[in-house]
Amino acid sequence: MNISAVSREEMGSQLLSEIAAYRYQVFVETLGWQLDCPVGRELDQFDHANAHYLLLREDSGALAGCARLLPTLQPYLLQQVFPMLAPGLLPKDASVWELSRFAVLSPAQFGTRQRAAAAEPRQSSGELLNNALPQFSSQQTIALLQAALDYARSLGARRLVTVSPVGIDRLLSMAGFNTCALAPAQTVGGHRLFACQIECQARRVPRPLVLGRSASAQAA
């Protein structure tokens, strides 16, 4: 397993296409999200010049995970798509970045998950950190999230915000991450969502997790 970081400005067209294809396979083909994107390629208006990416690769070199970081001084997903989740509390601060389009899924697992079981709403507003409990048994997922926090800290971030399903803060806390809700959860598109804040610091020694088999795919 290898995790690397790259900015959108540094990224060549070939790598951008690889990320877009991977995200399409995860979010559209596997999780069944209804996104406004061309067949085979998922990018949105937040994949702009100021975006940064974390990429997880298998030993074979195949892309098996990704995450996007956005500065809150620029337009970002929580601010533009989900402002109702943090009314009057939307950060616009160099020390706060947003985590979105977070996913960990091996190409061998593409299309194998039951879409009906996916926690994410099947619409463009479905930007969630993960697909419920089993995914947090994945050491790859924890490693990618910690790498995102470390990289964000190198960019000047002290905390990240992300749109998450109710309960994800508890799971993150159990995994050793320091989280809190910016505001009470709300129902959006039939799903209970909230704006989650994650501190950019090394995680604590986690409490033991008793989870099922891992099959990791998240968002946003």
Segments from the language model and where they lie:
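Short, solvent-exposed loop/turn elements at beta->coil junctions and helix N-caps
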Residues: 39-45, 183-186
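Short hydrophobic/aromatic beta-strand element in the GNAT-like acyltransferase core
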Residues: 51-55, 66, 96
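Short, His- and charge-rich active-site/binding loops that engage polyanionic ligands
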Residues: 58-91
